[in-house]
Amino acid sequence: MNFETVIGLEVHVELNTNSKIFSPTSAHFGNDQNANTNVIDWSFPGVLPVLNKGVVDAGIKAALALNMDIHKKMHFDRKNYFYPDNPKAYQISQFDEPIGYNGWIEVELEDGTTKKIGIERAHLEEDAGKNTHGTDGYSYVDLNRQGVPLIEIVSEADMRSPEEAYAYLTALKEVIQYAGISDVKMEEGSMRVDANISLRPYGQEKFGTKTELKNLNSFSNVRKGLEYEVQRQAEILRSGGQIRQETRRYDEANKATILMRVKEGAADYRYFPEPDLPLFEISDEWIEEMRTELPEFPKERRARYVSDLGLSDYDASQLTANKVTSDFFEKAVALGGDAKQVSNWLQGEVAQFLNAEGKTLEQIELTPENLVEMIAIIEDGTISSKIAKKVFVHLAKNGGGAREYVEKAGMVQISDPAVLIPIIHQVFADNEAAVADFKSGKRNADKAFTGFLMKATKGQANPQVALKLLAQELAKLKEN
């Protein structure tokens, strides 16, 4: 029997506000343990939450970016559970009336087709702290993350393969990043994914029993975990067994999913309205204000890069996959840089340098201004493409002006015939054997002089000018 795969994803996105959702403490990542905490985060008796307006702003932007309806009257709920990283013994979240609902996103699949994936809801909530189990036998609680604002985006069960799930996450990450509400860095926990997967016989409308997957710390592991589950569940069903509703984690080392616990239902959390927070009204004016702050999204940018700038679909897709790269490209073109040349550098030398150094574009000294200047001095013949690679490395590490560096470092290309011709004559004088081979008609003897000339000029001869002059002088040499 063959089965249809049914996948839905729950994505937690950490919002990039300066402070937490219900307390004024810093929400920034990377500080010392428990440095970003106060009495609200520790749940001292008598403290009350105060909603951060910036979190609602971000929630509205997310809902608009994902084509969602917005609840004009919004409230929060308590989700009750006990765990050491949750001092209140409940989480403030949204249950029956999330900020956004009934949305969708269009994703591009590997075969070039597109598919619309439904989004059931997007709700605001606070993050929990973090438990660390030490080798000394003690467990430690860090509450820096406690109260950091999250938006949980819950898709419809519209994906039919691990590949579609991967494409959905890629598109979702792009949209959230472009909306400016999160840096969506999985390595820092600002984007976390849980997957729900079930199988059913083809033609059956009723969903099968779902399994939830956790510990999916990369898009690649999401795909691998889902691929494993497809095989595991299919084998159980074909052998006459039943799938249990459970939570499993993906073990990267063993490339398998492992049982964590039997899955809880919503009733286990005993949701009820948060009594310490009022009902919040979101006006049409507020929504429209947030709409005006949204930028051009990747799909629209890709289309413009192709139609207005003449880039290929591939180049446009690569440039817009990351907002930082796309914004850099936009500024470079606005400064007068040739779109194709800027694109080639960003996808070629720049990308290779970043991979080798383990850095991002924001972490190096290259700017749109000095990249455009470097491309300009390649085009006007000041430097060759070969020299430009060395210039780029200097700019990436040290910044500064491209032309100024080239002149100070003595890298200016030699293009003046009055300078090159005497050097060519000296090359002839220094390589009498090669001259004799050339005059005798030895095959490809002329090729050696190109290397001699570039060596004599330390690679600074303008190749086009130098080759033309060399051919001219060799012709004269043959006549004599």
Curated annotation (Swiss-Prot):
Function field: Allows the formation of correctly charged Asn-tRNA(Asn) or Gln-tRNA(Gln) through the transamidation of misacylated Asp-tRNA(Asn) or Glu-tRNA(Gln) in organisms which lack either or both of asparaginyl-tRNA or glutaminyl-tRNA synthetases. The reaction takes place in the presence of glutamine and ATP through an activated phospho-Asp-tRNA(Asn) or phospho-Glu-tRNA(Gln).
UniProt-recorded Gene Ontology molecular function terms: asparaginyl-tRNA synthase (glutamine-hydrolyzing) activity; ATP binding; glutaminyl-tRNA synthase (glutamine-hydrolyzing) activity
Keywords of the record: ATP-binding, Ligase, Nucleotide-binding, Protein biosynthesis
Enzyme Commission number: 6.3.5.-
Keyword flag Iron-sulfur: no
Quaternary structure (record): Heterotrimer of A, B and C subunits.
GO biological process annotation, one example: translation
SUPFAM superfamilies: GatB/YqeY motif (SSF89095), Glutamine synthetase/guanido kinase (SSF55931)
Reactions catalysed according to its record: L-glutamyl-tRNA(Gln) + L-glutamine + ATP + H2O = L-glutaminyl-tRNA(Gln) + L-glutamate + ADP + phosphate + H(+); L-aspartyl-tRNA(Asn) + L-glutamine + ATP + H2O = L-asparaginyl-tRNA(Asn) + L-glutamate + ADP + phosphate + 2 H(+)
Family statement drawn from the similarity comment of this UniProt entry: Belongs to the GatB/GatE family. GatB subfamily.
Entry-linked Pfam families: GatB_N, GatB_Yqey
Designated name of the protein: Aspartyl/glutamyl-tRNA(Asn/Gln) amidotransferase subunit B
Disulphide-bridged cysteine pairs: none
Cross-referenced HAMAP family: GatB
PANTHER family per the UniProt record, alphabetical: GLUTAMYL-TRNA GLN AMIDOTRANSFERASE SUBUNIT B MITOCHONDRIAL AND PROKARYOTIC PET112-RELATED, GLUTAMYL-TRNA(GLN) AMIDOTRANSFERASE SUBUNIT B, MITOCHONDRIAL
